[in-house]
Amino acid sequence: MKKISVMILGAFLMLGASVLSANSQNLQIFSVDNAKGTINAKTVQKAFGDVGVIVDVNNDMNSIFSKRYGSVHHKKYNLAIFTNETIVKKLMNKYPSIGMITPLTMSIYSGADKSINISTLSLAGMARITKIPATNADLIAYSKLVDAALHKALPNGKYLSVNHALNTNKELVTEFTTEFELEDGDTYIDVKNGFKEEFESEISPVGFLVPKSYTYEHDAYDFFDTYSIIRFNAIYPVSKNHPDAGAYAPFSVVIYKKKGDETVHIAYPSISNWIDDLDIKEEATINAVRETQDMMKDILEELTE
């Protein structure tokens, strides 16, 4: 019989200012003048790759939005996902929660002042979601690598002042646990793949897409997979007044099982966090975000019963 326990983790991670430098905000926006138009999503992708940050998906959202909704909010708007497998695997040794920000995400967008901007999670934001200490050397290295990529992508750029809310009463993470039953001849990989197929068949009809999934091999795990997931009906209204939402979207669902442990863990950063983290005030947009959180939570509750 499958066993399930659903745990909503809501504690805010206390972070020392001394290890977070000047930026204790959960997201960061790096910006530079682009009046000549020489910088674009493709040049950003190449620059990230040059420093060892691999951009696996880099979507022109305006193309999607114009076809689906008939209008766009920004002259240029891309959502991209990126990783550094070496650092991710190091963090997996002790912190499977790294899967909740694997891949990392960014929005690449034009400003009204002819600037180009990139929004990503800061070190504080990475630590907050994963509960990996902000003093962890590998997490710091990851943050520094992102910083190097941003400077490479936007020469002479600078970080903009961000004053979003730091505290929230909402759950930071939505997490489930269950057990997989093995039938004759099955492996845990077989059952996990079956779960993945069922999961995707449930989320697709209600507007969720999986731009990319990752399978990591690691000696400590029977399996460790992450799914990068997006729902256009959420990101479209959010991005109108909050283009920096790309630091959170697409969001990642991690599913893993440690060797010697019967428990299968499934978790993702709660989508409802966007409301406070991005200072969303528009009622219709808030409703779209809450609907997206509830839909994903309900689907995973059903699948893990």
Would you name each region that the model predicts?
Residues 29-35, 77, 128-137, 180-186, ...:
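Second-shell loop/turn segments in exported
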Residues 74-99, 211-242, 246-248:
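Compact, glycine-rich, soluble single-domain proteins
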Residues 1-8:
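Bacterial N-terminal signal peptides that target proteins for export
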Residues 22-64, 155-202, 210-212, 219:
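Terminal, regulation- and interaction-focused segments at domain boundaries
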